């Protein structure tokens, strides 16, 4: 069932996307998560959708949503595209996708597991930090083989 705010959110998002030569292809509000996550999927009308497209749309939509005061309380805004590579590698991607659900794979087991799922907190020189349902997880960066956006929410 579609969240009741989605039509109003789309009314704001569609013209903003059009101004950026983008199209809104979907929106969903995951209110069962803490904090709730508003995900808006976009695509570029004239080229492959880039991380920069998502960032530009995210900034514009965040400003519009704040001004309209549609969503009460704290929430996370995710702007994404099915065409974006789901692997994170650059520092910029780790900053842009903070708060997103990720899967971290390691070359050696840590506490008996080689795959960790949680919300990305940050990456520094030594660790990748996740929030796993309120629990802080620090994974040594030298053991990390892959960090991938998670299509399924944790």
Swiss-Prot record:
One of its GO terms (cellular component) is cytosol. Keywords: Cytoplasm, Ribosome biogenesis. CDD domains: YlxS_C (cd01734). Its main location: cytoplasm. One of its GO terms (biological process) is ribosomal small subunit assembly. It is found in: Cytoplasm. InterPro entries: Ribosome_maturation_RimP (IPR003728), RimP_C (IPR028998), RimP_C_sf (IPR036847), RimP_N (IPR028989), RimP_N_sf (IPR035956). Pfam families: DUF150_C (PF17384), RimP_N (PF02576). Belongs to the RimP family. HAMAP family: RimP. Required for maturation of 30S ribosomal subunits. PANTHER family: RIBOSOME MATURATION FACTOR RIMP. This is Ribosome maturation factor RimP.
């Amino acid at each position: 069932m579609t969240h009741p705010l989605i039509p109003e959110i789309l009314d704001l998002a569609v013209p903003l996307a059009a101004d950026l030569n983008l199209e809104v292809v979907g929106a969903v509000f995951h209110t069962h998560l803490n904090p709730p996550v508003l995900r808006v999927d976009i695509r570029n009308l004239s080229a492959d959708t880039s991380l920069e497209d998502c960032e530009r749309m995210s900034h514009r939509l965040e400003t519009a949503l704040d001004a309209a005061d549609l969503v009460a309380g704290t929430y996370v805004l995710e702007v994404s595209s099915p065409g974006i590579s789901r692997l994170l590698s650059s520092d910029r991607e780790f900053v842009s996708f903070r708060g997103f659900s990720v899967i971290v794979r390691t070359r050696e087991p840590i506490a008996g597991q080689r795959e960790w799922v949680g919300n990305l907190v940050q990456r520094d020189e030594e660790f990748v930090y996740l929030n796993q349902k309120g629990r802080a997880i620090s994974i040594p960066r030298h053991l990390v083989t892959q960090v991938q956006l998670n299509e399924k929410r944790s």
